């Protein structure tokens, strides 16, 4: 039986929710039964380190299509975009063979939405960023990366891979992010460990799902590195960091600025723009904060 078991991917389990299947160790010994409710971050950590599960085989018709070619309105399609994102991330964490096709289809869907309705897409970020869920935040990262990448001058293929990275880089944080954002307490050591490990855990989940594009994985790996070498997980600095990773980092930072958390209020857009303008001073490639400011304009949608 142990040969049929696979590792539990980051993002597959959530604190406070029942296990969707029995969990085994590497030798096939049962650790926890289906339905057990995970209570703590340390339990979640142990399951990611030791846990295995037996995947269910599901037959799918070959003609199933993942890309929708309809003209897009971001407000009308908001629910569909979030549902598609959640389904895609679940496909990755469950190592579904359709995961890569779903991710590419979602990237095309989001890029098409941004291309057809740029002002509405940016307005959606600003209107819905007051107290967003983790899935909403991830969607906002994808939207902002789309616009910054093109303003910065990335070629189309690299820009699409950046969108894919934006949608998956925080996969390993999905189980705990909403809980962390709603807490006004100091982070525990376990919580800090989850945060610092999430880039590499997200990469592990992508690889396990058959998503192995080297540039995509490098963007995910580097999106919390800092130009001064103080970032994680590798402590890279300066030109060692991909511009795509800096674009994703800035997108996440901007969404954090305009988002309310339990421990602080959100910035208004004018304040956020002023802070972004200071980030060209050694924290990012100067052209990247400038690109975001150009995307936003003097009066963002």
Predicted segments, located by residue:
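Helix-turn-helix-type domain boundary/helix-start signal
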Residues: 36-37, 152, 185, 210, ...
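Terminal helices and disordered tails flanking the catalytic cores of nucleotide-processing hydrolases
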Residues: 1-109, 265-301
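Short acidic/histidine-centered micro-motifs embedded in hydrophobic/aromatic stretches
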Residues: 106, 127, 165, 198, ...
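Alpha-helix N-cap and coil->helix boundary residues
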Residues: 157-158, 175, 211, 215, ...
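Acidic/His-rich, divalent-metal-binding segments that scaffold phosphate/diphosphate chemistry
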Residues: 63-196, 203-208
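Alpha-helical scaffolds flanking conserved acidic
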Residues: 155-168, 215-219, 241-247
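Hydrophobic (often cysteine-bearing) scaffold residues that line and stabilize catalytic clefts
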Residues: 137-140, 198, 216, 285
